[in-house]
């Protein structure tokens, strides 16, 4: 799975990237602001974005809403030590993970997203097969 990380603290972003790699996933980029997260998402189209809530130029929830406005299928997990619950709930993020983040919790979240991606891909393949057969029969 291809993952984009957005955290304004470089050391946290690097640590998070190392944890994601440890779980056998690919890092497409590590950026330091909500604005950079939007730009990087548009460029890389990752399978998942792990995004800090508190960042300069645009907080994580606002960046999340911006990404989802352009790509409703985007999968974004907010990561934060503390964030206003109203803002995070309305962000569209699929999950909110508390900092400090432990490897077990991160791995479980990554596995959930990877399984969701597999199920979605299988459903698309099945639907394509049904449509193809219907066209051949029709």
Please place each PLM-identified region on the residue numbering.
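Two-component/phosphorelay signaling modules centered on CheY-like receiver
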Residues: 10-29
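Active-site residues of response regulator receiver
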Residues: 52
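Acidic catalytic/metal-coordinating carboxylates
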Residues: 33-36, 59-62
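As written
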Residues: 60, 89-97
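The feature encodes the CheY-like receiver
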Residues: 30, 56-57
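C-terminal output helix
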Residues: 101-112, 122-126
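Conserved sequence signature across two-component system core domains
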Residues: 6-7, 31, 49
């Amino acid at each position: 799975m291809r993952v984009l990380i957005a955290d304004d603290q470089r050391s946290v972003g690097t640590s998070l990237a190392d944890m994601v790699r440890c779980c056998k996933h690919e890092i497409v980029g590590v950026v330091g602001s909500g604005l950079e997260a939007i730009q990087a998402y548009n460029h890389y189209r990752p399978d998942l974005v792990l995004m800090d809530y508190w960042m300069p130029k645009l907080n994580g929830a606002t960046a999340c809403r911006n990404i989802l406005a352009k790509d409703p299928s985007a999968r974004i997990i907010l990561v934060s030590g503390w964030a206003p619950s109203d803002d995070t709930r309305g962000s569209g993020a699929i999950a909110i993970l508390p900092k400090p983040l432990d490897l077990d919790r991160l791995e479980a979240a990554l596995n959930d997203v990877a399984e969701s991606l597999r199920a979605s891909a299988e459903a698309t393949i099945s639907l394509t097969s049904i449509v193809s057969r219907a066209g051949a029969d029709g």
